[in-house]
Swiss-Prot record:
It holds the Pfam family Glutaredoxin. InterPro entries: GLR_AS (IPR011767), Glutaredoxin (IPR002109), Glutaredoxin_euk/vir (IPR011899), Glutaredoxin_subgr (IPR014025), Thioredoxin-like_sf (IPR036249). The lineage of its organism: Eukaryota, Fungi, Fungi incertae sedis, Mucoromycota, Glomeromycotina. It comes from Rhizophagus irregularis (strain DAOM 181602 / DAOM 197198 / MUCL 43194). Coiled coil: none annotated. PANTHER family: GLUTAREDOXIN 2, GLUTAREDOXIN-1-RELATED. Its main location: cytoplasm. Multifunctional enzyme with glutathione-dependent oxidoreductase, glutathione peroxidase and glutathione S-transferase (GST) activity. The disulfide bond functions as an electron carrier in the glutathione-dependent synthesis of deoxyribonucleotides by the enzyme ribonucleotide reductase. In addition, it is also involved in reducing cytosolic protein- and non-protein-disulfides in a coupled system with glutathione reductase. May play a role in protection against oxidative stress caused by superoxide in vivo by regulating the redox state of the protein sulfhydryl groups. This is Glutaredoxin-1. Disulfide bonds join 25-28.
């Protein structure tokens, strides 16, 4: 698991916005569209297309207590899923988070 942990942590730290996603997930597509509207290009790891996707999702659950996708991080901080991203957009906190990118 330490190899997976190292990989996930590196992705989170090296991408200002990092999304762990599944290519077919409608919530992931909505989150990607929301970020695109804000001119944000997230790093994306499509778990269903990654040979280590299941292990990555297991580690993310351990790290965040969230077992669903999308699983979004901004500047290394866990934001949550699509509903959390949309709530942050609606209350203005998302604009503040991405302003410093």
């Amino acid at each position: 698991m330490s190899q997976i942990k190292d990989r996930v942590e590196k992705l989170i730290q090296t991408n200002p916005v990092m999304m762990f996603s599944k290519s077919f997930c409608p919530y992931c597509k909505k989150a990607k569209a929301t970020l695109k509207e804000l001119n944000v290009e997230p790093g994306i790891c499509e778990l269903d297309e990654d040979s280590e996707g299941r292990a990555i999702q297991d580690y993310l659950k351990e790290k965040t207590s969230q077992n669903t996708v999308p699983n979004i991080f901004i500047k290394g901080q866990h934001v949550g899923g699509c509903d959390d991203l949309l709530a942050a957009k609606d209350n203005g906190s998302l604009s503040k988070m991405i302003a410093a990118l």
